[in-house]
Amino acid sequence: MAIVKEGYSLIFVMFATGLLLIFFGFWPIAVICMFLALFFIYFFRDPNITITQGEGLILSPCNGTVLEVKEKSDGQSVIRVFLSVFDVHLQRTPVSGTVKKVEYRPGKFLKAHDPQAHIVNEKNIITIENENGVYVVEQIAGILARRCVSWVKPGDILKAGDKIGVIKFGSQVDLYMPEGYKIDVKKGDTVVSGVTVFASIR
């Protein structure tokens, strides 16, 4: 199983500190450091998956639990997903297409279940376009997740399921999609990045 590169430094520091503390005989603190190193390995895991294939599908951009499925007045739909600290935290593109824009927006760090979190919290906004429309993936920071990392830039050409970024320590991902799709998930569903079908074109 691979590890997301953003976890390397944390894992190394915890292991190195633990070994140093063992050398000097500080076993209780060393055990805590080793436990944290193992937790970071688990948290930043990048498991091998088989990407769901098919025409006209929108895949889940993240692992987690669906918080809300909502149709907006302009015909767009939005699906909001909560990521706990136990979920895989890397994000994948829900569709094939071209990255049109990547925007960082500073903000607050409210907990993901706060109804205002998706509006006021710090976030990265990744806009992807293909022949079926425009799709927006929002990586949203939270009360613990204080850093959202995007791995893509405008002009990048993506295939559905490609990795696009990571959020550190639990938060929320929102996906906005154009009209013309049948939603295949509901509130409370557990979803898997690149595997679960969010919606299919009508």
What are these regions (language model features)?
Residues 1-202:
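Contiguous, well-folded functional domains in the mature portion of proteins
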